[in-house]
Curated annotation (Swiss-Prot):
Record keywords: 4Fe-4S, Iron, Iron-sulfur, Metal-binding
Pfam families given in the database record: Fe_hyd_lg_C
Protein family according to the UniProt entry: Belongs to the NARF family.
Keyword Transferase included in the entry's annotation: no
UniProt gene name: NAR1
Coiled coil: none
Keyword Disulfide bond set for record: no
Protein's UniProt name: Cytosolic Fe-S cluster assembly factor NAR1
Residues involved in [4Fe-4S] cluster 2 binding: 246, 307, 591, 595
GO BP terms: iron-sulfur cluster assembly
Function (record text): Component of the cytosolic Fe/S protein assembly machinery. Required for maturation of extramitochondrial Fe/S proteins. May play a role in the transfer of pre-assembled Fe/S clusters to target apoproteins.
GO cellular component: cytosolic [4Fe-4S] assembly targeting complex
Disordered, as annotated region: 57-77, 209-231, 599-637, 709-739
GO MF annotation list: 4 iron, 4 sulfur cluster binding; iron-sulfur cluster binding; metal ion binding
Amino acid sequence: MAFSGALTLTDLNDYLGPSQACIKPVQAADVPSQDHSDVSALAASASTHIAIDHDGAYYESSTPPSSSLSAADSRPRQRTKLETAQISLNDCLACSGCVTSAESVLITMQSQDEMRRAIAELNQSNANKLVVASISTQSLASLSAKYTFQHPQPSSSRSASTSTLPLRVLLHRISYFLKTVFGFDHVYDTTFARHIALKEHQREFFQRRENARKRAKLSNAPADDDDRLHPDQVDGPTLPMLASACPGWICYAEKTHGELLPYISTTKSPQQVAGVIAKRFLPERLGLLAPSAPDQPSIYHVTVMPCYDKKLEASRPDFYDDITGTKEVDCVLTTGELDKLMLDEAFDICTPVPGEQEAIQESIAELSLQQAFNTPNPDVGSASVSMMPRLPRLPQLLDQPGSSSGGYLFLLMRAVWLDWISVHWDSLPLSVREQGILPKLDVRVIRTTDFTEFVLRAPTQLVEPCNDDTSQSSILFRGAQCYGFRNLQNLVRKLQKQTGVRNTRGAAARLVDADGNAIGAAAARNRASSAKARARGRGGMMRRARAGAAAVVKSSPLNPDAEAVDVTQLQLSTAHEEDERGYDYVEVMACPSGCVNGGGQIRPPTQSDVDVTRSSTTVDNHATDPEGYTKGGWAADQAGDHDGLELMLNKTCSNKTSAVPDEADEEKEVRGWQGTSKEWVRRVEEAYWQDSSVAQTRVTVAAVNRAVDQGGANDSGSSTPTLVGSGANTPLSSSNAKSIRVEDHQRLLESLAVSNAERAQRTRVVKLGGDAMAYADVLAELVVNELCLLAAPAGDALALDSARDKLFRTQYRAVQDEAVNGLAVQW
């Protein structure tokens, strides 16, 4: 089985080959002796031997004391067969021992071989079975990038829409492969599960924000009020909130920074939400979990993910389904493993499959809600499922504005903006409401685009002051995208400074209770540290230095002193306001560039792949690049004929057109996992957004922003909402590497635009295909409510909320140092 460069360490001198010598041995209790006359003498004279038989079995044999040797010689020695230790990912302590000892042994429980074995076992049984697969869009994008490179489009058909293999086509072909070869019943992408996870993420964020506002009100209450509660007596977690969809980040936080666990979102990842749909919703709709069912069905759920750490996430004991008696996700395959599986079965994903066009047209056809909910599902191909289900058609490849790592930050930013709009809509001028309104958005790239801050500001000059607790500040939301382990270190320091918590290493677990709240004396210390941090005025000197420098640059030549003072005060006030605000939310991912560059993704082509592509590609009279593509395609954006290829092959090259600043050079050196590069990640990113309707829509933000800013100066500092994107295939120029991606910014601004037409469209008839996102909202609410009613049949509001939290929430626990360094292992 092949592993990515993210897990394979070849340059360590303490590397050990895979073996059964595990770091977590099986413990066995000693049997008490029946003869207590002289236990010490017997222990001193007796001995135990462990022998290996010819069949590889282990046997324990006991040698009697020397006083009874004559009697022992007359009878055969007693032997006891020892049980073989079974080690799986359930036994993972997150100690990093598998990296240098037994990587293959631990991963065997989550591999294509295990999937083959499990499906073969299901096929041999006579019980009802349901086999479901969930495929991530990042995996589809990686496959699209690979096979588009290996099978370039002819020059006559080259266009933006045909330059890559469409994700919808890939999804249908993979679905055909899994159903015909392995007998899968349903194959979905994870976008609908992600949609439910995002809705739950939004629900949790507003709960935390409400808790934060309650604590703020209690802090501002008069001190002589005897009935005043302490702010820390408000139940529930508060802000900032950190993303929890990345298992690598969760593993790192549990091992190293247990003090941050109360701030990590408890919402399940899209993979685990897909498991809830596969193990709860689908069987219930298919009638497999009905009381009249003859026996318990066998449900097997496989996911295809861009990350090896998703295997660890699926193996967590928290994700065990008590109803079905199985895990929410039984097996996780990486993108590379799925690709190898198709190659082993001689399946050509570039060849159309029977009924492809009809199936794709049917998937995008406009259907009313009644038709979409009551159409018999054609995906049921297993003979064991005999009933005609009324399974709603799940939407495919939902276009979620935001990043290619899930769009968590952008979703919350939009939700906060729409919440502000709903409160202040009637107070806005009629001309602004008709034309459209956008917030002020500050985007700041910190060193590289893998650490980007977003500050959402309300256009306060258009709204009369109100009495809510948010009117004191124009900042509605402050968040960040933090990708890569190097940026995680900076993020942790920022969060510790903002919250006042400390890294207590071994005592990390004692800071967090079962619900993720700080407890005991450690909680008191954290409160004191947080108060001191707020009193210090975090980052004052650094901010003032930068503000002063900016003021000198922006001084007016006619009156430099007055202008410099005005700009300095403005920027000082803005910096102080942002610093006091802190982060509301951070989208954290452990991989550089996010999930499209996960450790389980397909690696870039090697030199041999390039040579094969060159020799197999027919070249016409037009000029071609080194990859065999006609110039003007993907390679047209590169600095020279060979630069794109050299970047993709992870080799150094020189820019032939323009000098690159030092900051851009530093950005170019930032690579993903071993064997990949920024250029290849960019191609996967382009494949991910190729069908994005938001990215293909041009919005002239500058005109709208001027309407918002009339009557007042733009006080948003480094606000950049005047960028206009040119589609999903707009490249990130190497000469401007520290700027925000234009297409990312375009998608964000498009999702934030609100007008009367936008509000009127919300009352129209919802149809699948016509507006997949609106249909997904309705279906997501239906799925969540139905699952909650199944878990809490009484229908009580508190019981339904508790059932919802149990279905879509989880908890995290700090790992103490003793478990990490092996001292907790009992030999």
